[in-house]
Amino acid sequence: MALTVTWLPGLTHDWFTVPGKGNFSPSSLRNWLSLLTHVAGHSGWPHLVTNFSLILLIGPMLEESYGSLALLVMIVITALVTGILNVVFFTTGLMGASGVVFMMILLASFTNFSRGEIPLTFILVLVLYLGDQLLKSFGDGNISYFAHIAGGFCGSLFGFFIPPRRY
């Protein structure tokens, strides 16, 4: 689906982009659906390949650790959070799975840790990732670094409050 969406720019803009602040119409079913579907829309081939390569790399480990349903719920929540925040705070549209990717990156650091401890990998990834995203936020205006940060925040919360399955 994401490949088709990426190759059909009109479809991507109409159905797979969350409108920005002032452009979201509460009476539009398409706008409400875009709060979830924006993660399938991508600005081009490099954007799609980068996001889905990381999802394919990290996703199976998280699915094994948390289960398919729990991971799906985390993805849906992250999509909703990034979409809603974009509608509330930003005038530009939002598309792509980068928020989901960063949720997965930070969640992955929690897969093998003891409760009551903060994993060192989490601290390192958080510092490197957050620093990188904050620095980049002063550059290219076409990338929603805020969505990346919001996705990472979701992954951090999921990691702290949803324990991985133990076998």
For each feature predicted by the language model, list its residue ranges.
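A detector for small-residue-rich transmembrane helices and their helix-helix packing motifs
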Residues: 1-167
